Amino acid sequence: MDTVETLEGKINRSDYKILIVDDVVSNVLLLKILLTNEKFQVCTANNGTACIEMARKEHPDLILLDVMMPDMNGFDTATVLKKEEGTKDIPIIFLTALNTPQDLVHGFQVGASDFLTKPFNKEELVMRVTQQISLVAAKRIIEKQNQELLATLTNRDKMYSVIAHDLRSPMA
């Protein structure tokens, strides 16, 4: 638990973008106000198709996705997002009035990272969003450390190659 608290303390929320997707304008506005007050960057879409386009264009760090929308529902939208290389790793929190075990299972099967049931509690929303953003931040740290480690290993191998060459052909 200390590691998560420490990581959350290091997170600059303004570095993270959240895509809010809901066909009900009042829900979008409420979520936008809540998350901008928490210092997150926010972009919005009002349907599944617009969500997919916005995710491709904006590369959000998290998507809050309504399930019950006309044309393309949230489950179908998530399925498309999880199949595309550029969007497959974006965590998705479903916002839904659906709360049966079958709905939850289906949501996780199509790629949900978490669920929030409508009507949602503000504090719970902020905590779940912060938790997902913490995981995104941790993943970024791990990826950066892996790149640094690979660079170190490459340099080490070059150094070993030079040493081996020098040992095979000493100066006269």
Predicted regions and their residues:
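Short amphipathic alpha-helix used as the core "switch/output" element in two-component signaling
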Residues: 53, 75-88
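Active-site beta3 strand of CheY-like receiver
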Residues: 58-67
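Non-catalytic signal-transmission and effector/linker regions of two-component phosphorelay proteins
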Residues: 1-19
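The feature encodes the CheY-like receiver
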Residues: 28, 70-73, 88, 100, ...
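Acidic catalytic/metal-coordinating carboxylates
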Residues: 26, 46-50, 73-79
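Primarily the dimerization/phosphotransfer
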Residues: 147-172
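Two-component/phosphorelay signaling modules centered on CheY-like receiver
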Residues: 25-43, 57
